[in-house]
């Protein structure tokens, strides 16, 4: 007798989405989560007398997904706030800044002030990139199969296909340099694309990162009211409203497999939960290498391939804290009188290194060292959402830093690196910003490993090109099914990848439901 029809392991937003769709379809589902609450890296937590987002607070791609309506998330409390400008793109040398708006015309108007020589280049870029971005979004929404790809392409009258295929083979730098003369125009796109993925922008296969600006013009970025965690909170309510079950503080030890079929999930405390279908919404490397004692014959080649892959290491950290006054960036004097109509304190500030310093940062990462000009994404969540103010009424900040390798030379325990990042961030501001910080904390890769059960602090990502995806390479990641009957993979490590997107969870649920219907 099974305990449920399906078990979803991992309560991050993709696991929650998958579970919610299954429960909505009438599938008896148990969600298993190692932590004492769901949400994963999309969580908002209480600490230091304030609420902090675990990772980025800006949500974009998920707002293009039908799941918000299909799971009735607005009814369950999800409400997005939109900053007047999405990003301020800044640089360590404190010049060349520019402002990015969701509206393309506003962005172009701003560039005519800050980078007039790049205006025509940006228009030419959008003319080419918008159709590619539209196609990429449709593929992500519909799933990775050749018939669905052709259907999406037909709906667009085949517009953008040739560039999508060409860009998917190229590097991000190659594509960007086809349009922009000034690296200040393209480095912010690299900072939120290949750098976040941990890949050099010169690497072949990173070219679709160049759609980043076009995508943000198509889909408005927003922040959930009361923090990023309002998203998983709403999904959880949707899931529970349809009879879903949750087991918290339940750490998975291994999967039980019999006759090439998944049979049960064995927990560290010795409890066993049985179900004919198991969806692992977590690091696929950990699932396939550490949770399966003896690979059944049909899965031996798959398991062997994953065993040969090194266990990936995390490279991102985040500082959170409370500040007495809003920061005054040095770029504000550069933009003074030109963008007074925009409340720039609401925007995320991307502080990018030069191309040369980024190359150096990649080399240092491999040596367990950290650049003196790291990529930084800074935000003041309370400037847009008063409900994110600290209990004492002061503002809160978040600062993401890349690269900060898990295998840091000297280790993280006694490291002074987080203090150094605050100093580097402060160099981008007027006055003594460091003295304005009353409390702060550091989420480094070792902390992500300890508190969020992320092996080596690593957040997985999906890196295959669209072409490789469409022809079905690494089918366990692109099609979500493994050779072990009843075992599926989902989450950030599966198509179409990481970030607050929700497409992996949605598409996996569709795949599982189709398999259940056909069984």
Where are these regions (language model features)?
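N-terminal glycine-rich phosphate/pyrophosphate-binding loop and immediately adjacent elements
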Residues: 2-138
């Amino acid at each position: 007798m099974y305990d449920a029809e399906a078990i979803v392991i991992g309560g991050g937003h993709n696991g929650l989405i998958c579970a919610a769709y299954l429960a909505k379809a009438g599938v008896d589902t148990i969600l298993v989560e190692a932590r004492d609450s769901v949400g994963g890296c999309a969580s908002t937590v209480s600490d230091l007398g304030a609420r902090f987002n675990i990772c980025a607070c800006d949500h974009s791609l998920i707002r293009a997904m039908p799941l918000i309506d299909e799971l009735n998330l607005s009814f369950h409390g999800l409400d997005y706030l939109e900053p007047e400008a999405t990003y301020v793109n800044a640089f360590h040398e404190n010049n060349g800044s520019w402002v990015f708006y969701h509206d393309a015309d506003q962005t172009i108007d701003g560039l005519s002030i800050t980078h007039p020589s790049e205006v025509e280049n940006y228009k030419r870029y959008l003319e080419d990139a918008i159709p590619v971005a539209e196609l990429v979004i449709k593929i992500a929404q519909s799933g990775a199969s050749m018939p669905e790809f052709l259907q999406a392409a037909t709906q667009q009258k085949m517009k953008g296909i040739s560039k999508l295929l060409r860009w998917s083979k190229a590097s991000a730098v190659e594509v960007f340099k086809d349009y922009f003369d000034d690296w200040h125009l393209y480095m912010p796109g690299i900072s939120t694309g290949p750098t976040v993925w941990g890949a050099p922008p010169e690497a072949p296969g990173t070219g679709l990162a160049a759609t980043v600006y076009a995508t943000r013009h198509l889909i408005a970025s927003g922040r959930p009211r009361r923090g990023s965690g309002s998203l998983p909170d709403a999904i959880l309510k949707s899931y529970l409203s349809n009879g879903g079950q949750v087991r918290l503080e339940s750490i998975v030890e291994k999967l039980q497999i019999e006759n090439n079929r998944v049979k049960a999930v064995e927990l560290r405390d010795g409890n066993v939960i049985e179900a004919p279908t198991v969806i692992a919404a977590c690091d696929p490397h950990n699932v396939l290498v550490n949770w399966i004692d003896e690979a059944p014959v049909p899965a031996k080649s798959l398991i062997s391939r994953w065993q040969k892959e090194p266990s990936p290491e995390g490279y991102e950290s985040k500082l959170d804290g409370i500040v007495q006054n809003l920061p005054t960036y040095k770029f504000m004097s550069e933009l003074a009188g030109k963008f007074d109509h925009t409340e720039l304190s609401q925007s995320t500030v991307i502080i990018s290194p030069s191309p040369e310093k980024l190359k150096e940062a990649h080399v240092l990462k491999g040596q367990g060292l950290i650049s003196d000009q790291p990529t930084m994404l800074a935000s003041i969540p309370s400037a847009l959402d008063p409900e994110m103010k600290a209990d004492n009424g002061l503002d809160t900040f978040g600062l993401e830093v890349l690269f900060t390798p898990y295998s840091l030379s000297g280790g993280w325990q006694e490291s002074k690196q987080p203090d150094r990042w605050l100093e580097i961030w402060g160099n981008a501001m007027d006055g003594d910003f460091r003295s304005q910080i009353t409390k702060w904390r550091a989420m480094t890769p070792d902390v992500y490993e300890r508190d969020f059960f992320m092996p080596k602090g690593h957040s997985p990502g999906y890196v295959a090109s669209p072409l490789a995806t469409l022809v079905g390479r690494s089918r366990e990641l692109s099609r979500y099914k493994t050779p072990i009957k009843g075992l599926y993979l989902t989450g950030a490590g599966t198509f179409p990848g990481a970030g607050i997107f929700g497409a992996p969870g949605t598409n996996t649920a569709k795949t599982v439901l189709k398999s259940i219907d056909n069984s």
